[in-house]
């Protein structure tokens, strides 16, 4: 990405601190697909264009973790079996999307759908923009499994590896898969959204991938997932609360159930990082500071619908305005993780480790101060058409 991800914005749009700044030049031809055609040819450019991310990604750094540290994760396989796999649920005890939706085999199916659609009529457009954005994020699950399988020392080497790390990744993916399925079916039945535009956005997003800047390092990767799972827990929890306020108890139950899953997954990922702090406090605090200096980018930051190159920024601005996921949440999550991992109490660190410790411990209040200043300078937010809701205008 040509511009650094910057959480401290003072634009006219009230963008949250985790949003990416708009790009002056988008859909750049700097992205190359493997091809037998000659590079630079018009044919190559035409083939590549539909598959390019809507914005540039960072210079890619790979395999930054020293090879000897891979042994740490191999040695933790039994620990992961006993301490991480316990946060998975047996399939037979898991909820399924059908538990919350009209039964298509029931004689009352048509009536159940009518009731769902009547409830959905009472929900405002801006809420649906956020719910659709959350659903699209969940539906890009193939990207997230791919990301986990880039991590050295914990990846699924065969596709059916029996290691605890590989089992976790596959089973976590299987549990998460229900989230997008459930929200997708609800939105389809609601009649409030343009499903074809949503489906295009999902395809674009999966094709674009993501740019978490985790460098194949499980230190960076598990810090990232710890942050993300808590962020999705907060986001789905807030959509549940607001659905209830809008009178749709069933939708509130859907969002709340998904939030509970995210909380359980957050517990697993934060436990992994807690163990890394125990084994390698210096390396782990350096990784924590590294991820926070880069700024945590949301998994769907390359979102695109075929029209709006800054779609993620616009979706994020609506989420910020509604209080679904905000700059304050970003700072609160960081503060929570600092406390959860007892970063302020680490001792015996190197000089660089102490600097990293000081940086992450001081960062939450700094983020809050800068965000307050940005909000104070922000002008009246514009409105924007969203293709997901048939180009109806929504205030950012």
From Swiss-Prot:
InterPro entries: FADS-2_CS (IPR005803), Fatty_acid_desaturase-2 (IPR005067), Ferritin-like_SF (IPR009078), RNR-like (IPR012348). Fe cation 1 binds at residues 138, 176, 179, 262. GO terms for biological process: fatty acid biosynthetic process. Higher levels in developing seeds than in leaf and root tissues. GO terms for cellular component: chloroplast. It comes from the Eukaryota. Residues 1-33 form a transit peptide. Pathway: Lipid metabolism; fatty acid metabolism. It catalyses: octadecanoyl-[ACP] + 2 reduced [2Fe-2S]-[ferredoxin] + O2 + 2 H(+) = (9Z)-octadecenoyl-[ACP] + 2 oxidized [2Fe-2S]-[ferredoxin] + 2 H2O. Binds 2 Fe(2+) ions per subunit. Homodimer. This is Stearoyl-[acyl-carrier-protein] 9-desaturase, chloroplastic. The lineage of its organism: Eukaryota, Viridiplantae, Streptophyta, Embryophyta, Tracheophyta.
């Amino acid at each position: 990405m040509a511009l650094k991800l910057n959480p401290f914005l003072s634009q006219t749009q009230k963008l949250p601190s985790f949003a990416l700044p708009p790009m002056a030049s988008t859909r750049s031809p700097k992205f190359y697909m493997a091809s037998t055609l000659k590079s630079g040819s018009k044919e190559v450019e035409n083939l590549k264009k539909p598959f390019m991310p809507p914005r540039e990604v960072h210079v890619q750094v790979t395999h930054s973790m020293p090879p000897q540290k891979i042994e740490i994760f191999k040695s933790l396989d039994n620990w992961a079996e006993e301490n991480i796999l316990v946060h998975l649920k047996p399939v037979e005890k898991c909820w399924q999307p059908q538990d919350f939706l009209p039964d298509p085999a029931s004689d009352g199916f048509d009536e159940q759908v009518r009731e769902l659609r009547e409830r959905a009529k009472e929900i405002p457009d801006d809420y649906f923009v956020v719910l659709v954005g959350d659903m699209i994020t969940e539906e890009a699950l193939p990207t997230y499994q791919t990301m986990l399988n880039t991590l050295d020392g914990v990846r699924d080497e065969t596709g059916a590896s029996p290691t605890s790390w590989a089992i976790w990744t596959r089973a976590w993916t299987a549990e998460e898969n229900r989230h997008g399925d459930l929200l997708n079916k609800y939105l389809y039945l609601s009649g409030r959204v343009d499903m074809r535009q949503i489906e295009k956005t999902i395809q674009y997003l999966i094709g674009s991938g993501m740019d978490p800047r985790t460098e194949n390092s499980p230190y960076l990767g598990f810090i990232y997932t710890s942050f993300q799972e808590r962020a999705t827990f907060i986001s789905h929890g807030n959509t549940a609360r607001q659905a209830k306020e809008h009178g749709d108890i069933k939708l509130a139950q859907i969002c709340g159930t998904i939030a509970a899953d995210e909380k359980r997954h957050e517990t697993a990922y934060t436990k992994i990082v807690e163990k890394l702090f125990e084994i390698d406090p210096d390396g782990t605090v350096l990784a924590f500071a590294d991820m926070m200096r880069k700024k945590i980018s949301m998994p769907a930051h390359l979102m695109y619908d075929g029209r709006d190159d800054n779609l993620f920024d616009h979706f994020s601005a609506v989420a910020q305005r509604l209080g679904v996921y905000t700059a304050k949440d970003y700072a609160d999550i960081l503060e929570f993780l600092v406390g959860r991992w007892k970063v302020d109490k680490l001792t015996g660190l190197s000089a660089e480790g102490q600097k990293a410790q000081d940086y992450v411990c001081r960062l939450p209040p700094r983020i809050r101060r800068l965000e307050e200043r940005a909000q104070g300078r922000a002008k009246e937010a514009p409105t924007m058409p969203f293709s997901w809701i048939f180009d109806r205008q929504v205030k950012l």
